[in-house]
């Protein structure tokens, strides 16, 4: 399990490394373009939802537990980017087959 650490939020958010690697690419693409967006996920214990406003001016860190980066699924990246560009903001959608 990796961690997303966002200085605008509270506690680090635990996210599986494969998912976190895909989210990292979406975050970096949006922030490179200067596009703030919302990101919603569940707490590590899934007891509540966490909504974050992701903005280029706030520090962001991705911590991975694995030593090797996972293979990126381009179809999943596109689905996540579509979600990030929607009015609801970025939500983790199920990974489609390659």
Residue ranges and their predicted role:
Residues 1-21, 25-98:
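Positively charged, low-complexity terminal tracts
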